[in-house]
Amino acid sequence: MDSAIDISSDSDVEIQETRTRPQHPPRIAEGSHRRDLSTLRPHFLSGSSSGANGHTKTGLTNLDSRNGFESKPLPRAEHHTHIPGNGSIVTSRIPNISVGDYEKFSSQQAFKRTHPPTFSRPPFPPRPDIGTSNGNASHFRGGAHDDLGMGRVTNGTRILPPSVAHGTSASPSHFNGLSDPMHRNGIGEERNSENDERLIYQAALQELNQPKSEVDLPAGLLSVPLMKHQKIALAWMFQKETNSLHCMGGILADDQGLGKTVSTIALILKQMHEAKLKSKNSGNQEAEALDLDADDESENAFEKPESKASNGSGVNGDSGIKKAKGEEASTSTRKFNRKRPAAGTLIVCPASVVRQWARELDEKVTDEAKLSVLIYHGGNRTKDPIELAKYDVVMTTYAIVSNEVPKQPLVDDDENDEKNSEKYGLASGFSINKKRKNVVGTTKKSKKKKGNNNAGDSSDPDSGTLAKVGWFRVVLDEAQTIKNHRTQVARACCGLRAKRRWCLSGTPIQNTIDDLYSYFRFLKYDPYAVYKSFCHQIKGPISRNSLQGYKKLQAVLRAIMLRRTKGTLLDGQPIINLPPKTINLSQVDFSVEERSFYVKLESDSRSQFKAYAAAGTLNQNYANILLMLLRLRQACDHPQLVKRYNSDSVGKVSEEAVKKLPKEDLVSLLSRLESSPICCVCHDPPEDPVVTLCGHIFCYQCVSDYITGDEDTCPAPRCREQLAHDVVFSKSTLRSCVADDLGCSSSEDNSHDKSVFQNGEFSSSKIKAVLDILQSLSNQGTSNSTQNGQMASSSQQPNDDDDDDDDDVTIVEKTSLKSTPSNGGPIKTIIFSQWTGMLDLVELSLIENSIEFRRLDGTMSLIARDRAVKEFSNDPDVKVMIMSLKAGNLGLNMIAACHVILLDLWWNPTTEDQAIDRAHRIGQTRPVTVTRITIKNTVEDRILALQEEKRKMVASAFGEDHGGSSATRLTVDDLKYLFMV
């Protein structure tokens, strides 16, 4: 066996073992003459140049400028290498090396990622026998038809570029990695952004239309057949993983309910099947080399061996999915990765859908192809990275990733004002100049941890198990979770080490174009993974010329994103046949008492806003302004939500613990709660606000995910204090203790407990509208009649673009509950609200009217949520599910329901769309009716208009609308509009 030779001049460790015969450098056969290889430049790199066949090609310079790409001349090569005995001069940026080393060097370094996947390839004669010495094999030989020799690979490890490794002949343009800096050369020099953009633009030109190539899995892998659009997704994803220059992975942005989960499972099975075939076909010719796809240049390559599943069952205690049997990684893998074991696929998803992923992997994969699966969740999860690396698929939550993986640093040019304005959805003119002081409870241990923030350092003692393995693939489900690149969870996800990276999201843009930067950074999509380049190349053109800027963004996205909506056509037919979805906008009116209350509240809020504007303190009071908006929105649901109704959810444990705190701490914590802060999780003014012992403010529902879950550390930035019920306090609890210490009465705080609503005060115009709908549905279910239950008509003509371009969606002016064709199942309804206080009021109304229901919100444990979903789906007597929009809009499959009611409006219409698609998705057999209940002549009218602006912005970014730019954030003008100033 030849000794290992290190030929890398940067931080790569590139090693090749030849067990059967030496590997020869690539050969270029030539009949009667030799050519200067420096002239073999791709035709698109200049205005006109000679191609491989001698014909003149017209450049794309003008097209570049029209689409916002900078058309700068490419720099010429800097080094020249003479190949003895050949007479050819190879122009290259590769440093001069000895002739003896060149043979080994050329096969590994000179061809590292040398061409984009979409280059057209002219037909060539059959490739010579691989590995056969023919003539002077140590030198290049040019010819009219060029070809390459290559070494065989094992376990899917690539030695040469993808097209070569997969047996495809290469055109002369492929060799320009030797002469052009546009290609990644493995010598530590990055590509110029202009060159990167040329490649991206070239790829976009090749993919102007939706992909149509299909790939199916071999029989016996999936228990369900792939639909046509899923076969197309599989072909596209597999191509991106094996033959992509830009990044190994991408964004699958199909609409909710189109089966992104199944497409991803198919990709996992496809790759593992291909790896097994390569292993069998390699025979005894085994050449181990650095995998050129490893995304981290400073780390050794890691390759996940083929499936290690064995007979058995269980997913971390759950039956039905096979466990790994504990095999060790291959010798070569261990040799290259003494520090970082090679693992399989990591799926990161919200806690509410972890078990749904497990069910999909169990039900959709056949017993013969069963994957070894681990749910990495719970206090008893393994701490051994070698154990973690035994599984084909590992599923975990964003909270665990945020806690275990060292965070990538913030981008360099984040100004304080910009950070806060982007964080809270405000324009860049807003700022906050308040410093947060650490109140109580910060221990020396936690301070030490906070200072230890070496991004990506797996040797960091604070790094968890997830950071101590090298993943073959990382999949972010509901990837919009990382849309804010400044959050801990986004920076932690970017710190994961992986060779392939995927973002799954039906709504990749929710607030601003900046949402995309976080995906680009995670995917390592150069040059846009650098924030300065992202701003210069994408945000700048959009701000200067929205029409051309959005066209460029579409081209940038086309290279890495596949997006289909439910209205997309394939061969003239809908991409999927779903029952129709009807969206009703029902505008009801206040009662006299409610209108009087709202008018007074709106007048006071408008006066306060004008006072801030007159004093020039809008920026400093942005939290108070958002709080005033919150109160106006809540007043549209129920006046009692504004009148400080507090369920005091923190309970007795908190009440006992707060009595033990010093008085100065009580006063400090209460002062924080009363200063109108922002929730550290959802970045909105908190509903049912609570404060932790470490001094951070949350909605009780938001922080409950951490208290009741397994990640019991504070989610606030740079804080790792432990959370429990006895360190979370509500305003009423703190006021009560402070009043007791001061000898004051706290009766004011207790004047709005639940007993108030049990005396008939829990109803409101919206709740009455909900009961009318449910009564109408109950009558339909009992009599199977075809009569329609009518509600109040809408006074607003819906906009034609008010939905997401779904061809099967009808938007009507009046809320009419059309009868659903009976298929033997009961008619069930989901009721969404943003506020748990409103869910409490709806719950009391349902109880009073003897309507069987289940509830799902963020304060419930995962087990309780799962039980509620199962009972709603399977129990025919349970007709209603009341759900928090925060907890129920992601990932859940609720096709048992065919009616959806939205009680209040969210700033982002995509969040509402996600909630609706819990019911309108694959598997639904009945028409789905959606009712959005709003109040006439209130702030909700203006929110509807702002939602429409956001829809236009998203449509412009994706090329789904030919309109121009739209406002993308809450600007000062937006706020003036909302307050009618």
Swiss-Prot record:
The keyword Transcription regulation applies. GO terms for molecular function: ATP binding; DNA binding; helicase activity; hydrolase activity; zinc ion binding. Residues 181-194 have a biased composition (Basic and acidic residues). Pfam families: Helicase_C, SNF2-rel_dom, zf-C3HC4. Its EC number is 3.6.4.-. Residues 46-65, 166-176, 779-798 have a biased composition (Polar residues). Residues 1-66, 112-194, 293-337, 439-462, 779-808 are annotated as: Disordered. Its main location: nucleus. GO terms for biological process: gene silencing by siRNA-directed DNA methylation. Residues 119-128 have a biased composition (Pro residues). Keywords: ATP-binding, Chromatin regulator, DNA-binding, Helicase, Hydrolase, Metal-binding, Nucleotide-binding, Nucleus, RNA-mediated gene silencing, Transcription, Transcription regulation, Zinc, Zinc-finger. GO terms for cellular component: nucleus. ATP binds at residues 254-261. A zinc finger (RING-type) spans 679-718. Residues 804-976 form the Helicase C-terminal domain. Residues 241-526 form the Helicase ATP-binding domain. It is found in: Nucleus. Residues 439-451 have a biased composition (Basic residues). InterPro entries: Helicase_ATP-bd, Helicase_C-like, P-loop_NTPase, SNF2-like_sf, SNF2/RAD54-like_C, SNF2_N, SNF2_RAD54_helicase_TF, Znf_C3HC4_RING-type. Belongs to the SNF2/RAD54 helicase family. RAD16 subfamily. Interacts with SUVR2. Probable helicase-like transcription factor involved in transcriptional gene silencing. Associates with SUVR2 and contributes to transcriptional gene silencing at RNA-directed DNA methylation (RdDM) target loci but also at RdDM-independent target loci. May be involved in nucleosome positioning to form ordered nucleosome arrays on chromatin. Associates with SUVR2 and functions redundantly with FRG1. Required for the efficient methylation of a broad range of RdDM target loci. This is Helicase-like transcription factor CHR28. It comes from Arabidopsis thaliana (Mouse-ear cress). The lineage of its organism: Eukaryota, Viridiplantae, Streptophyta, Embryophyta, Tracheophyta.
